[in-house]
């Protein structure tokens, strides 16, 4: 790929919103048959030792699963705060639930997002990565 073509691609990607970038990530995962998650190394248990407990996820995918019609305004406000989206983009995201809010978030941040959305009246799922 030429340097000019690469720079044009970088410029085009830089103009995408967070929501558009998340959709692009999903499309690329589907097209290439991959998952954009960091690999997790799991050590084998020592010989004769019992298997270790299940490793708890440190990163989570946060998905808005439900936004009741009578609670949408409050949920949109929280989504804007979390994602930095504009009013229209946040409204579109909330109305299209179930929709991914954050592709990757540390556990504390994911739980905080879940608490805020649930306080506003929505429902969220956290999927460990």
Curated annotation (Swiss-Prot):
UniProt xrefs under HAMAP family: Ribosomal_bL12
Its job: Forms part of the ribosomal stalk which helps the ribosome interact with GTP-bound translation factors. Is thus essential for accurate translation.
InterPro entries: Ribosomal_bL12, Ribosomal_bL12_C, Ribosomal_bL12_C/ClpS-like, Ribosomal_bL12_oligo, Ribosomal_bL12_oligo_N_sf
Transmembrane segments: none
Keyword Methyltransferase set for record: no
Subunit structure: Homodimer. Part of the ribosomal stalk of the 50S ribosomal subunit. Forms a multimeric L10(L12)X complex, where L10 forms an elongated spine to which 2 to 4 L12 dimers bind in a sequential fashion. Binds GTP-bound translation factors.
Name of the protein in its database record: Large ribosomal subunit protein bL12
A GO term for molecular function: structural constituent of ribosome
NCBIfam families for this protein: L12
GO biological process terms, semicolon-separated: translation
One GO term describing the cellular component: ribosome
Record keywords: Ribonucleoprotein, Ribosomal protein
Record organism: Protochlamydia amoebophila (strain UWE25)
Record-stated family: Belongs to the bacterial ribosomal protein bL12 family.
């Amino acid at each position: 790929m030429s340097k000019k073509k690469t720079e044009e691609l970088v410029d085009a990607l830089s103009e995408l919103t967070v929501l558009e970038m998340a959709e692009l990530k999903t499309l690329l995962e589907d097209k290439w048959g991959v998952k954009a998650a960091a690999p997790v190394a799991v050590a084998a248990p020592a010989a004769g030792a019992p298997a270790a407990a299940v490793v708890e996820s440190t990163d989570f995918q946060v998905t808005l699963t439900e936004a009741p019609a009578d609670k949408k305004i409050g949920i949109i406000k929280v989504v804007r705060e979390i994602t930095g989206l504009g009013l229209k983009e946040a409204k579109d995201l909330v109305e299209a639930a179930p929709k991914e809010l954050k592709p990757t978030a540390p556990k504390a941040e994911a739980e905080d997002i879940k608490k805020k959305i649930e306080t506003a009246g929505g429902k969220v799922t956290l999927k460990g990565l």
